């Protein structure tokens, strides 16, 4: 399906009425009034417009999505309703499933036009095809518009010979041949809405109001205040703060990573882009305009939009792949024989691995719904190829539950990338769960913030408290193995073993042999041996915080040769020799 389309159903002339269409705009993502071309299409020539969000209470009660993400969504809906009130309209939150809800609404409201934002993800495309078929049978015109991505993803795939690009370099080459993204559409005005105002009943809030967390079955006792406030209003305020960083835009200054980088920033944007509270096109062109202003009309380089483009890259890779979030049946995923270790997975997810750096990150994620993109790299590497050798699919599910900005494409794509299962990552780079944190925050304040039981440890021992003398542990009132778990693995031994495992797997992928990927693989490389230069976009509003970045370690990598090579076809990637599993490293301790 094209990214923007009109499905012209056979609409009886009398149903349109002399005064125009009876429109319903269906909000899903795209929870905003700015740059919403599908909403403008609903208003155009209409006598009546209703804005609808369909929420299934049963799904809320049964899904694995965590409370922080539901709270962010409900806040975003409240904000949207508030904005619509200012236009003398309201948001209709309809309970149920789209396939059940729309036939009733079409009949009850006399709907003649349905509009919504195009969804590029496989599940969304399948759902929308069914709704469009239903609308056509009911004589309802359907209008869809693309505004969740910068580019027409189908066009990118077409330019690449009808297959998605599997390297970021190739993706950049393709979009450099395309026209610039469309400019953001103007926001709907009060004058436009006034001419097509729908009747609002006195009991609107009872029937169509935004539900509370309690109504959806979430216990809120002990729930802390939201670190990230949902909604378009907050998103636009954050965008303004983000763009105040003119020095970065002008000079490519990359602030060095430090403890403050790990905390939620008032300019962070990733959850707002995920829910569509902020338009990616508005952000793109605000950055573009600012760059031209401070650089005196110079054309911005693609790298200025790096985090946005990584998001686009993963959307392109996923759009025609319904198995993108799993190994089996996924044509781009290397079939690595991961271990089944539910105990290790649970300790990782609950922040009980015995490595304070990893546990603090997972605690922040569970409490706040967000972690810095390099923190994501650290915990993803630890779960998969670095230490626990657990499938990236398990990581996807945990992040999908806890992470505010998790979506199908970017979440799964990032996990495949970080676990070396796709997109040609350098498997011999390994994040040290002690050294990386210590270099980032030598004082250990981040650890003390999220693991207060360790706050009494001096900085010397806080990243590896198991090495602290007994007297230090007693003084800190935290005995390792009693009050805080011992390390779940011996990192030095396990990481070497896992690099060897990965080396075996890549050796069996004959496609790589001629590319010298294994020419000189050290037994273990602790990545990021120098302080990290943080991408400018991350703390100034981390766009797609899971987005990959160049890893800095040692001499030029053979990955460069790999990127220059022709991409392997999807069919060949499915023919993976399964490697005989090597003996699993015994956990150093089973303390919980």
Curated annotation (Swiss-Prot):
The gene is Cry2. Phosphorylation on Ser-265 by MAPK is important for the inhibition of CLOCK-BMAL1-mediated transcriptional activity. Phosphorylation by CSKNE requires interaction with PER1 or PER2. Phosphorylated in a circadian manner at Ser-553 and Ser-557 in the suprachiasmatic nucleus (SCN) and liver. Phosphorylation at Ser-557 by DYRK1A promotes subsequent phosphorylation at Ser-553 by GSK3-beta: the two-step phosphorylation at the neighboring Ser residues leads to its proteasomal degradation. Changing residue 428 to D: Abolishes binding of FBXL3 and SKP1. Strongly decreases CRY2 degradation. This is Cryptochrome-2. The lineage of its organism: Eukaryota, Metazoa, Chordata, Craniata, Vertebrata. It comes from Mus musculus. Changing residue 499 to D: Abolishes binding of FBXL3 and SKP1. Strongly decreases CRY2 degradation. Disruption phenotype: Animals show longer circadian periods. Double knockouts of CRY1 and CRY2 show slightly decrease body weight and lose the cycling rhythmicity of feeding behavior, energy expenditure and glucocorticorids expression. Glucose homeostasis is severely disrupted and animals exhibit elevated blood glucose in response to acute feeding after an overnight fast as well as severely impaired glucose clearance in a glucose tolerance test. When challenged with high-fat diet, animals rapidly gain weight and surpass that of wild-type mice, despite displaying hypophagia. PROSITE patterns: PHR_CRY_ALPHA_BETA. Belongs to the DNA photolyase class-1 family. FAD binds at residues 270, 307, 373, 405-407. Its cofactor is FAD; (6R)-5,10-methylene-5,6,7,8-tetrahydrofolate.
